[in-house]
Regions:
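Cap/lid segment of the alpha/beta-hydrolase catalytic domain
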Residues: 135-221, 267, 432-454, 516-536
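A catalytic-pocket lid/entrance helix-loop region that shapes and gates access to the active site
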Residues: 241-243, 248-370, 526-543
């Protein structure tokens, strides 16, 4: 995936980009095994040896049928219809395969259908992968060329548009302004429909899974021996959702940069703009160099090496998170303007100064946000963001004033971001509302609690998934300004608190790559914490998640809690939360010069 740091709006393309990542993950031959529930965690399974082979004659309307009974679907539906299957012969770039499209009708006559697709390779290894979506979904993820990876590996693949249709992709990233308030050609009305919202949150995954299982059995004569969910961003949230809600359906989960606290993540850019209603609180892009320089000055050295990389993310977070520690401290004191008044708003240098109001805004962005009342699963805060090298990324900082803010006239635009429907539609139930009218703990509080139950994948109790033998690998980046690394870290901790470290280590890996963004890529910063100019390099980030998860699930080969990742000529330990790579001695570009250390 392209680096969001270079262009925050690139996240609009997430479905296609996420699929590219998925192709990379799944284009590997793997072993197969048993279909039933794994008797106990760690049980080795005997592999199946022969693929099931089909031809076009095996995938016909007569054999497949035109519908699926509603009783076969584990969430309420109005019906399931199937389109005539299509056969594609092998080409130099693809194996032969069949495509089955279908539509799952809503129970609510005003609702939207779930469009889904199942792709069935001619030679099937008894594996299946449900592919996660991206952004706010609205398109079937398998409509863009991913078959070269999954089908070549003899996996059946399937996915859906999650129950609403968008003519163009619309995600929930945080551009600072502009763009259609709905962000898609399918209309905004779906955001006012309860069934459509709940489909997006969780039901579409189960409905699509159950339909795909019926189709797979009708075509091959049996269901998959191993079923995986692989997703990035929204798809990563979906992957964790199915582990939390439908654990019996999946053997392995790969979740990349999951948007766990989805309901608040959509609201977060509005919370920042609300904080910036007074002109004196408005942080502009001119301050970016000073902000990232201050992060580096205080946090670069915390990993034992000043090289333009903040590896010790937990200690760095603790410096700037005002929700913990001394509430009277000021981590931004070094940048405070004389008398707390910014007299040079156009200063773009690393020496730019901040007003007291701007400092309060930065404290808010880099501290846990406390809710008026707990949301789903008892979550009391939203983790917000960590010290990073991309403080303007994804609209965290904008150079525009919006209706409802001081200095914005009556004709000023209302603030818009790609997930605005999650605020005006899901929450405010008025797509024409001004999102800056939101008040924490106000009249919308009960609605906040309700949609949180539908959308947030924050249940720390993964015991059902663990007991059925499921395995998961979750990877996040601390420079991610599209997701919230703070909320991801807080979720990791909640799972450890609930289940215990020893148990978690038997079935899950929570990997953290310091200083990479939403695409799990990033670079070192050219000015180290001591102010010296240093060469920049790509942050090591490359490792094969799918090979790891299949080996763990199917051969009981657990990945290490510390791996080695590479990029270019550099390598670095990849550590499990909360550990980080601490420099010991030796060449800084070699992983052997570091150790996995607790914060």
């Amino acid at each position: 995936m392209s680096n969001p740091k270079s262009n925050p709006r690139t996240w609009r393309r997430l479905p296609a980009l996420a699929q590219v990542c998925l192709i990379t993950f799944i284009a590997f031959p793997v072993a197969t095994g048993a279909a039933d529930l794994i008797p106990a965690p760690g049980t080795k399974l005997a592999p199946a040896t022969n693929d099931i082979v089909i031809t076009a004659a095996d995938v016909t309307v007569e054999k497949l049928g035109t519908n699926i009974p509603v009783s076969a679907i584990g969430e309420p539906v109005g019906g399931v219809t199937l389109s005539p299957p299509r056969w594609s012969d092998a080409t130099p770039n693809s194996v032969a395969y069949a495509t089955v499209d279908g539509a799952i009708a809503p129970k609510d006559p005003k609702g939207k259908p779930i469009n889904f697709r199942v792709m069935l390779p001619a030679s099937w290894s008894r594996h299946a992968i449900q592919m996660g979506g991206g952004g706010m979904n609205g398109t079937v993820p398998m409509m863009r060329g991913e078959r070269a990876g999954s089908l070549t590996a003899s996996f059946a693949t399937y996915g859906s548009d999650s129950g609403h249709q968008m003519g163009g992709f619309g995600g929930f990233g945080f551009p600072g302004g502009g763009g259609a308030r709905g962000g898609g050609g399918g209309g905004d009305d779906w955001a006012l429909n309860e069934e459509a919202i709940r489909n997006l949150g969780y039901m579409q995954m189960k409905k699509t899974h159950d339909a795909a299982m019926v189709i797979t059995e009708r075509v091959y004569g049996e269901r998959p021996r191993f079923n995986y969910y692989i997703g990035t961003s929204q798809g990563g949230r979906e992957a964790l959702t199915v582990a939390q809600r439908y654990p019996a359906d999946y053997d392995g989960i790969v979740a990349n940069v999951p948007i766990l606290n989805f309901s608040t993540l959509m609201l977060a850019p509005e919370l920042i703009r609300i904080q910036e209603k007074p002109l004196s609180n408005w942080v502009t892009r001119a301050k970016a160099n000073a902000i990232r320089g201050e992060f580096m000055r205080q946090a670069d050295k915390l990993d034992g090496l000043e090289d333009g990389v903040i590896n010790n993310y937990m200690a760095a977070r603790a410096l700037f998170d005002m929700s913990e520690g001394d509430p009277n401290r000021n981590p931004w004191a070094a940048l405070r303007a004389p008398d707390g008044v910014d007299t040079n708003s156009s200063d773009t240098s690393a020496n730019a100064r901040l007003s007291d109001g701007q400092i309060e805004t930065l404290k808010m962005v880099y501290s846990r946000y406390k809710f008026a009342t707990p949301l789903a699963n008892g979550v009391k805060t939203f983790g917000m963001w960590l010290p990073n090298t991309d403080p303007t990324g994804s609209g965290l900082i904008v150079d525009q004033r919006f209706r409802g803010q001081e200095g914005a006239g009556p004709s000023a635009p209302m603030h818009s971001q790609l997930g605005i429907l999650g605020v005006t539609g899901f929450l405010m139930q008025n797509v024409s509302a001004n999102p800056l009218d939101y008040v924490e703990g106000g009249a919308l509080n009960a609605r906040r609690e309700e949609i949180s139950k539908w959308l947030d994948s924050t249940d720390p109790d993964l015991s059902a998934f663990y007991k059925r033998g499921g395995k998961m690998i979750v990877t996040i980046g601390t420079d991610d300004t599209l997701s919230s690394p703070g909320s991801q870290l807080d979720y990791f901790q909640s799972v450890l608190d609930k289940m215990g470290r020893d148990t978690v280590d038997t079935f899950a890996r929570f990997f953290v790559i310091p200083q990479v963004g939403h695409g799990l890529s990033g670079r070192s910063y050219g000015t180290a914490g001591d102010g010296k100019t240093v060469p920049t390099f790509a942050i090591p980030n490359q490792y094969d998640r799918t090979a790891l998860i299949t080996a763990w699930v199917e051969r009981n080969e657990a990945p290490g809690k510390t791996l080695v990742v590479t990029a270019g000529g550099h390598s670095l330990p990849l550590c499990s939360y909360p550990n980080y790579p601490r420099y010991k001695s030796g060449p800084p570009e070699q992983a052997s010069s570091y150790e996995s250390a607790a914060p």
